[in-house]
Amino acid sequence: MKKNKIIILKNGTDVFGKKIEILINEEIIEKISENIEEKEFLNKENVKIIDVEKKLIMPGVIDVHTHMREPGITYKEDFETGSKACAKGGITTFYDMPNTVPATTTLENLLNKKELAGKKSVVNFGIHFGGSKNNNIDEIRKVLEKKEANTVKIFMNVTTGEMLIEDDEILKGIFENSELVLVHAENEMIDKAIALNQKYGKGLYVCHIPSADELKKVIEAKKNNKLNNEKHPIFAEVTPHHLFLNEKIRESNERNKMLLRMKPELRKKSDNEFLWKAINEGCIDTIGTDHAPHLIEEKMEKVTFGMPGVETSLALMLTAYNEGKIKLPVIQKLMCENPAEIMKIVRRGKLKEGYYADVIVVDTEKEWIAGVDDTLESKCGWTPYENWKLKGKNIMTIVNGEIVYEKGKINENAKKGKAIEFLK
């Protein structure tokens, strides 16, 4: 009879500073306590006991906003390289956006993308379905009815790919037929997205909010919904680059002028400060990377929008923690718990008995230099934070009970990640 594989994490600390030990049985967290007796497990070949030496144990990060470039643009990134970059950065589940080639705007394309990710990704994955300017309402209905996805992403401003939707009838159809709509909406398009949310009573997730002015609109709408007891929630996402970078940094040298370009563009330092304030006042729901890699040659040749982000997102937030800008429980809420709750992901996002064992071990004291002291896993091979001194680093990633990343290396023998399940 096959013996279950057991991992025991000893002498850890949780985000509240309490001692924590975790027993993982196969792919499930079986027990969490301050002290797990290991006597019965000693000298058994199917058991791995790891003393994490008081380091931080967290649920794996869930990044609901990535562009893994597969299918169709795989010279920039693919599900294998992108997922390895995730594992290194402490991300155990990513969601991929629909603006690939072909776009994820039909059930067939969605199923093909899921199959590709299932064969190649070393972490768990979800796929956002895409709304189309060619009116794919029938496909949206089909996908949602078959429970192959539970979110629809739309682009209300120009960005990478040909997915801008300007037709009000198509937007109406998408909001009428979806439960949660993710929007790329900038400036006055945020007003339009909020109006659609309020008119059709469906959930709205506003991606990568870059500025004080735009965030104020979302905060106001959230308040109004709460006051009116409305059941159609609005969620606010910010990215690490809109927290840590700004126009001044971009314009500081010729290299940055080319590399630090994305949609929405970087804003002022005062916008950085407002976003941080909003985080600490509980106005932000998630941190999403908007990982959108391009080769450095492309970036330096002409203005190309998008940057890699999954390898540095957690480390940047830990650096902010070490600088007193944010507390550890807030990081866990924004990067693990809230994404799982908003996307209705089954049994992930928390350290909880009976949940999948998506667990990371973090050294909050580790000082390192991004792009210098480590080997980048992303196919694009660069980071916008090169030479930044960071404090705090993921040192172990466990996905579904498998150690996928440890001691600076990807475990090439680990099982592949799973397609996420969501509440039906």
Where is each model-derived feature located?
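Histidine/acidic residue-rich metal-binding segments in metalloenzymes
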Residues: 138-287
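N-terminal metal-binding scaffold of metallo-dependent hydrolase/deaminase domains
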Residues: 1-43
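A glycine-rich helix N-cap at a beta->alpha junction
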Residues: 115-131
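Histidine-centered catalytic micro-motifs
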Residues: 60-71, 156, 182-185, 289
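C-terminal cap of metal-dependent C-N hydrolases
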Residues: 356-421
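Metal-associated gating/positioning segment near the N- to mid-region
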Residues: 55-120
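Active-site metal-binding motif and surrounding structural segment of the metallo-beta-lactamase
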Residues: 38-58
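His/Asp/Glu-enriched, well-ordered alpha-helical/loop segment
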Residues: 188-192, 198-201, 280-281, 285-287, ...
